[in-house]
């Protein structure tokens, strides 16, 4: 049997993060959780098995979800990116190439389908390696 996909979930709202993590874990994914972009970047440095980043747009700290997505795209091109928001719908030009967007609130099946689609887009790229930006 294949190893489960490893998802890094970045969401500052604890309830939203808990629900999303439960949905993803119930779908068979391994979920790592982070509350902000800085913590997520530290996790990526130590977890080369992360295959998909799923991040909220609006988060506290110096880097929001769009900034995190761009940084991850530049430093870890083997990681697929999914961005979610209930307040902001980014223009396609604001997103790194290959990034998908999902609007909140999202159905459980829509979330798992989006994660699988992002992961499929990354197949063949292997494990990521963090490069300094």
Question: What is the role of each PLM region?
Answer:
Residues 11:
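Conserved acidic carboxylate
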Residues 36, 63-68:
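Acidic catalytic/metal-coordinating carboxylates
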Residues 56-57:
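Active-site residues of response regulator receiver
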Residues 66-78:
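Short amphipathic alpha-helix used as the core "switch/output" element in two-component signaling
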Residues 106-119, 123-127:
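C-terminal output helix
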Residues 18-26:
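Charged docking surfaces used in two-component/phosphorelay signaling
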Residues 33-52, 92:
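Acidic, metal-coordinating helix/loop segments flanking the phosphotransfer/catalytic sites
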């Amino acid at each position: 049997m294949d190893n489960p996909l490893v998802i890094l979930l970045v969401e500052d709202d604890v309830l939203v993060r808990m629900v999303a993590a439960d949905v993803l874990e119930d779908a068979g994914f391994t979920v790592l959780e982070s509350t902000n972009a800085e913590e997520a970047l530290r996790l990526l440095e130590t977890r080369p098995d992360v295959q998909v980043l799923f991040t909220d747009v609006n988060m506290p700290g110096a880097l929001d979800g769009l900034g995190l997505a761009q940084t991850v795209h530049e430093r870890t091109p083997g990681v697929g990116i999914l961005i979610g928001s209930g307040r902001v719908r980014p223009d396609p030009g604001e997103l790194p190439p290959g990034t998908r967007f999902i609007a909140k609130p999202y159905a459980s099946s829509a979330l798992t389908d989006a994660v699988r689609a992002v992961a499929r887009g990354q197949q063949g790229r292997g494990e990521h390696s963090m490069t300094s930006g």
